[in-house]
Amino acid sequence: AITGAADAAEAIRTTDSVRKEVAIDGDGFTVAGMAKGAAMLQPNMATMLAVLTTDALAPPELLAEALTTGVARSFNTLSVDGCTSTNDTVLLFASGRSGRVDPDALTDAVTAACLSLAEQMAADAEGATKVVRVNVTGARSDAEADLAARAVANSALCKCSWFGEDPYWGRIASELGASGAMVDPSLLRISYGDTLVADGAVAVAHDASVVATHMAGSVIEITCALGVGNGSATILTNDLTHAYIDENMGTS
């Protein structure tokens, strides 16, 4: 029941300030879901729960494939604080009542549902005031791009500067260089939103007011172009605030 779903989404909350729900209309079927998670959140293995349901008719193998793809593109690109635990679970249940569906359409709908829930978790991260998307392009491989993006996303220094709305790209460059990914400073380009602020690891002239407006928003987009290959990755994260410390300085 609709009311039962809302009650369940409410019941699984821990330090979440709001319940997290989604419904995606597919081609003749629906994928719906709920999740909880606000900290100790860097899947794999973190304190997050997500339950998805669909009325699509699909064999277990197809459901597993759709969920694996969806999780890889959503929850596994999320890092609130780089911390993990032993409690993460993502489940997908299918009733089959709507009949058979196109496999690609099912994967797309499951992925969209997972991504929405992951974005809701980032927005509700403990103490967070901003959602931050760290995009890395031009890496030697997707794996190295993920390594580099995750290093920036998990940096306490970078997170503090985002909270302070300070576009200090030097911290980003430092984390990229220490990440283990191949980084050639002479090729590195860093942008906030659509504004290039560093080229070849050297500051470039730009409209500071445009960057300031971007930093003041609720969503910050950062792109790090490494220029050494075709690999790319995006990590979804957030800023680090005093409220996060207040929440976690004791046992919760």
State each model region's role.
Residues 1-252:
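Alpha/propeptide regions of enzymes that mature by internal proteolysis
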